[in-house]
Amino acid sequence: MNWKSLIFPVASVLLFSACGGEEPQAPAEFRFSNDRTAFENEANSTFSFDVRIDEAKTTEVQVQYATADGTALAGEDYIAASGSVVFAPGETKKTIDVSIIVDEWLEPDEYFIVSLSAPEGGYLRDNIQEAVGTIRNDDTSIQISDEGYTTPNNYPGMSLVWGDEFEVAGAPDPAKWTYDLGNGSWGWGNNELQNYTSSPENVTVQDGRLYIFARNEGGYTSARVKTQGIFDFQYGRVDIRAILPIGQGIWPALWMLGSDITTVGWPACGEIDIMELVGHQPRLVHGTFHWGPNNDERQYNGVIAPALEFPETFADEFHVFSLEWQEDEIKLLLDDQHYHTITPANMNGYEYPFNDAFFFIMNVAIGGNWPGDPDDTTPFPGFMAVDYIRVFQ
């Protein structure tokens, strides 16, 4: 045997000895295996998220994690968490626990995010580096501030002739309010998406306020209350103090229609929009008048009310939406700031319908030609809270 025949076996033995006889450990693939969705209650006060690696390892591997706000806020809706997830040899699954703050306050469904980062001994699986925790809300108590603008309960030379302070809990006072129900004709003429109900899920009096809730629970529902056939009036001052819902596709309104609508139709009866807001413009409200002999010749005249520097939106605190109405003139006011007037001179040659009796309507529409459809950013349930409505003459 010559020396050349020994060189390759010897080299193989040396290489095997240097590697310890084992294959190198493959990098671990870190990933989440679940999102988490649950109602906010004591039974679901902890959200657990599973983190997995593709296969057990012979040495320790780890990855960092941290929570981040979505629409849910750390310290208000959940407890912020961060740290390391360590996989001991042989382990393939670990759990991250995030504590949920349970309360009784009605609020929209909200979410937060848990993210993985800085893997040691492995890498992050594409598109599975984050998990979402969605906090569903089934509470009924409402938490809003009484902060904001207010108006007096009397004016010199005028008397309170009608109003509602919403002091009796439950359904709206049937001696003052009735309902429009259903989905109307062509979505109430605007391709709106909601079905109006008289359910306490959509309209209720609580803590001295009337609440109208816009919901999305297997279909859009809301409420539309009115005084038609119960109370109408001609001339005077109206004050309505309210907090408004906001969000894409949300459309709250405080408005009036001519009492002769059943005989002359719309828009010949006249329409006075004391306040309308389209939810994607949360710092702007509109005041508008509609008239004309028929739908083909309908006319309107409207303006945007002055935007306030504080609060940021009309959902943050109460504002008072008012009109001052006399023969041949109506003025619209926001927090006692006069911003628009209509007179017969604005009718474009058509009949002025605003010297006749009108009735009130208050509603929250969902979707429609003006605001557009809701999307994933729209907070549900949304609500309008009315503190009082008063008529002085």
Language model feature labels by segment:
Residues 1-8:
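Bacterial N-terminal signal peptides that target proteins for export
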Residues 16-18:
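C-terminal motif of bacterial Sec signal peptides marking the signal peptidase cleavage site
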Residues 21-144, 152-153:
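Short boundary segments that mark the start of a structured unit
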Residues 126, 137-393:
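GH16 jelly-roll
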